[in-house]
């Protein structure tokens, strides 16, 4: 197995309210090997700030990964369609300035089982159309948009999305593998990782578990080794990749309510039937 560099996702330190430079200092003091800023660095950081951040990371031998992208073209508050081109261009240009070749993109739209706008399959097609339009820009900047595995789509869906975009591993789209989010889409995390393995370019490494609830169950993050995610198998799979992968540890509070007992809920997951 190839050696990994192990760092953190900046959201892990959210309660501390650290600036990007303070986050790098935390990584240095705690012997982390890098930081993924999966949410970017706030509103429109200028180029001089980004260059100084990249230089500081390099001086301290830290890997740096970037985020702030989105891949579901719907407003999470209203559910209405919206253009995601500008936010992805900004994130990709920031990554390019930093000398980083990936941008983590979140799925801010409805969860797969939620109604409207449209069906999950229709939302997938609209997402693919939006991402196809980003291809030339991402190629020009040499940046891969890493779609985080979240509750908007299953890994089966994401493979269909890549097919709709006529893209292959190593091109302008990839995966940010969140090891526990598969629990929210009723997938086995290790099997989900295997499905999208060639596409994985960045990671959110975390353990998790589920608890029964009145309407189904709740998924939540757990201390590594205490949950149900087979991290040993997943990391073993990542170690077979030809390209280098960093392991960015992510921890966060809260859980996701999955209404598995609701009428018609299983129909939202045809690949798992």
Predicted regions and their residues:
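Histidine-acidic metal/acid-base catalytic patches
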Residues: 1-5, 20-28, 155-174, 183-273
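N-terminal pre-domain/capping segments
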Residues: 1-100, 270-273
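Hydrophobic faces of well-ordered beta-strands that scaffold small-molecule active sites
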Residues: 4-11, 35-37, 64-69, 103-105, ...
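A short, structure-level motif marking secondary-structure boundaries and short turns
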Residues: 7-10, 37-39, 75-77, 118-120, ...
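Conserved, mostly hydrophobic/aromatic
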Residues: 8, 27, 35, 57, ...
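Acidic-and-aromatic substrate-binding clefts and catalytic sites of carbohydrate-active enzymes
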Residues: 13-18, 37-49, 72-84, 111-115, ...
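A short, hydrophobic secondary-structure junction motif
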Residues: 28-38, 92-95, 127, 131, ...
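Active-site acidic/histidine proton-transfer and metal-coordination neighborhood
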Residues: 58-59, 63, 77-174
